[in-house]
Amino acid sequence: MKVTFTAPNKLAKKQTYTPDKIKEYKKLVRERFLEETQNSRFAEDEPLEIYITVLAKMPKGATPEEQARMFNGRANNAKTPDLNKITKIVCEALEGVAYKDTVQITKVTAIKAWSVYPSVWVTIEGEERKSDGHA
């Protein structure tokens, strides 16, 4: 099974991640997953790979040349948002909803890039076990 969904990137600004903001964002991520899958989830023993793309809003003061470099992937976003924190928040939000436990995640790929529309794209891929017991 493979599931891809998107959520707004509400954690993209320089800000403190308060427990309330994180709780609210986790709820939003869960809702987006459930909307996409109509409440299905991965098997409890299924190894999973998760791919997260965090699209941060381009700075307002960016010149047209800087914007072009950002769109073409030649300007790295080494500032905000904190990629590690967003990855952790997304994985924890989906625990118990998309999968039983985060220990099922065997591979995480996370990148961040610039965009006009800040958002977080999440793809989860599972390897369903065959009936003969082989992966």
PLM segments and residue spans:
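Acidic, proline/glycine-enriched N-terminal capping motif
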Residues: 1-135
